Amino acid sequence: MFIDKNLNWNHHITNLSKQLSRANGVLSKLRYNASLEFCLQVYYAIFYSHLTYGCNLWGFTSEENISKLEVLQNKCVRIMTFAPFNSSTNEIFIELGLGKVRDLISLNQLKSVYDFTQNCYLLTLWIFSLTVAMLIQHLVNWIVL
């Protein structure tokens, strides 16, 4: 992950775009000899994994950066399905059960918030149980004395 001194993600998105372009290249060569199911496995292995890594942090980047990633993801989906370069990808995403870049970012951010709240809840329970245990210990000591 790359972030500059101005706290922008341009360098990271540029690097990520290169990785995603390479993944598109692999899929474009693979699609002629592999099934769609296999191409989807490769998509998850080399495209999706790069796309979603750290998106909780860089997901708040500029609209321009998100658009770059959307273009690459749309190209990837068209490659896998042999769709024309100018065709709409909305139906393809639905048909394949894939999430779009913006949806993946939102989903991962929501998961992080949920995990954080669950951890806070567990921490609260742990503190409460310690407090109860300490109160019981004090009561036992008071009764014994």
Where do the language-model regions lie?
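Hydrophobic/basic alpha-helical segments
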Residues: 1-145
